[in-house]
Amino acid sequence: MKIDIDERIKNHYDLTPLTTFKIGGWAEFFILVKNQQELIEAINWAKIKKLPRLFLAGGSNILITKKKLRGLVIKISGEEYSVKGNIISVWAGTSLSKLAGITAGLGLSGLEWALGIPGSLGGATRGNAGAYGSDISGQVAEVEAYDIAKGE
């Protein structure tokens, strides 16, 4: 289902509450996306307007300038996941701590170290988050990516 992206884009959006440090400035344009289709539509909106894009998920380990961030800030949110046997496919916006709880509830091990860790799976994967001698790279089997330049 196509979304009306122009109605969802916010102008002059305060980013302060979106980081764990609770400091920062504002975005020229902002949108919250909750799934892959919304993400692609937001990327394409910025691409058509020739605007830079900044991706933000859980907001941990990031400092945002007090100055205006030019372009579109895309906040990746939502908690989509599916389970097939002992494999769980998870959307990048899913809270890492919540994912640890979900996997434990399913009887899957390996993410116990992530309970209480702030941030999202997308950010954790990008930065190889870890604690207590374990890290996310030991649990991720595959990452699906979108090539902005190719549009695929």
What are the language-model segments listed below?
Residues M1-L121, T125:
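Anion-binding (especially nucleotide phosphate/pyrophosphate-binding) glycine-rich loop
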Residues E112-A114, G123-E152:
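FAD-binding subdomain of flavoenzyme oxidoreductases
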